[in-house]
Amino acid sequence: MTEGARDFRGKGRAFRGVLGGESYRRLAALFGFQERFYRRAVGDLQLGPGGRALDLGCGPGGLSYALAEKSPADASIVGADISDDQLECARRGAGAFACGMEFLRASMDELPFPDGHFDLVMTSMALHETPPAVRRAAITETARLLKPGGTFLLVDWSRPRFGLWGIIWYPFCRWGERNRDNWNNVYPELCRERGLNLKEDDYINSISRRQVFVKEG
């Protein structure tokens, strides 16, 4: 089945597919997901010469852009998303960076790349939009796609800390089967089971947790 024909229903989509592309980007910015957020998410991670990165659920490209800002010209970044609107928005800004950038329509649990293809796999505020089974399959794919010693950057909401955003988001985060993984922070365990070991764990703001894992080997 080709990418264009693949049925992504049930895979999950930001804002349940109501908003996408530029509308999504503007609304997300109102909630603090701007350049500064994505730069903090990337932190000191970077690609070396010829390095390759994959952005799962890339949306309009904010996390990919933050990494591209500090990447050499011969590095490459691939963003994957199931929303054509998001991908179109991401592609519009890709030409501003020296490194290679590609944005393709693909689901994070079924990716068209060989084993050990990437030095870095990353995702920001995307896993919680997918069903639990898709999340687990996406982490399995991440472990498959990373080179030994490669890095997995996972940024998503977690149990809120004290602070304004924590107070605002608490009622939305606390209940529901879809939210349970994030509330209970099951990702370190899921990653460890797949050979990805936790190296960094902190918060970007009151609800956005940043975790860095390294693949064994």
What is the predicted function of each stretch?
Residues 1-22:
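N-terminal, positively charged/glycine-rich alpha-helical extensions of SAM-dependent methyltransferases
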Residues 7, 31, 153-194, 198-210:
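C-terminal alpha-helical "lid/dimerization" subdomain adjacent to the S-adenosyl-L-methionine
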Residues 23-40:
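Conserved SAM-binding loop and adjacent beta-strand
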Residues 50, 73, 146-151:
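Short glycine-dipeptide loop
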Residues 54, 59-110:
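Class I SAM-dependent methyltransferase SAM/SAH-binding core
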Residues 109-120:
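A short acidic, Gly/Pro-enriched loop at the edge of an enzyme's catalytic core
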Residues 120-133:
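A short SAM/SAH-binding and catalytic strip from SAM-dependent methyltransferases
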Residues 136-148:
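A short glycine-rich, Lys/Arg-flanked "PGG" loop and its adjoining helix->strand segment in the class I
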